[in-house]
A protein has these predicted regions:
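Domain-edge interaction signal
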Residues: 1-139
């Protein structure tokens, strides 16, 4: 198994825990996009990008991609915390995701990261992912 950062693991769980029913299931592109938007929101709050805990590249199609996050997603799938359907779309196993997050109750930064991830998901409810991709590609 490839390595991943603890923060990418938390975020991969938090995305699934906070994902509104109306957005389910999500693609791996959306998974990375929601994480990236959380990082951008943290930047706007005055946090250094390096403090996010893992990095991104932007694909030639304009989507953010994090190897650490992808490795975390792969781990969640192997552990049965998330399901992948025949179209490659992800949905949570809610009970297992919630229980796993509870194992990290002692991590002080989780509530803040949860709020950033939740806000990034709320953006998806009002801004089409294509518009977000266009903005990322042109920066």
């Amino acid at each position: 198994m490839d390595s991943f950062s603890p923060k990418s693991y938390y975020d991969s769980l938090l995305i699934m825990d906070e994902l509104p029913e109306s957005l389910r299931p999500i693609s791996f592109i959306e998974y990375h996009l929601f994480s990236y938007l959380g990082c951008v929101l943290a930047l706007f709050q005055g946090n250094a990008v390096s403090n996010w805990g893992y990095s991104y590249t932007v694909t030639e199609n304009g989507f953010p991609f994090s190897r650490d996050l992808q490795n975390s997603i792969d781990m969640l799938e192997k552990k049965g915390f998330i399901f992948v359907d025949e179209n490659g779309l992800f949905s949570p196993n809610p009970e297992l995701v919630t229980k796993e997050i509870e194992n990290f109750y002692f991590v002080d930064e989780i509530p803040k990261r949860r709020e950033l991830i939740k806000t990034s998901l709320e953006c998806a409810l009002s801004i089409p992912p294509g518009a977000i991709r266009y903005a990322i590609k042109d920066t």
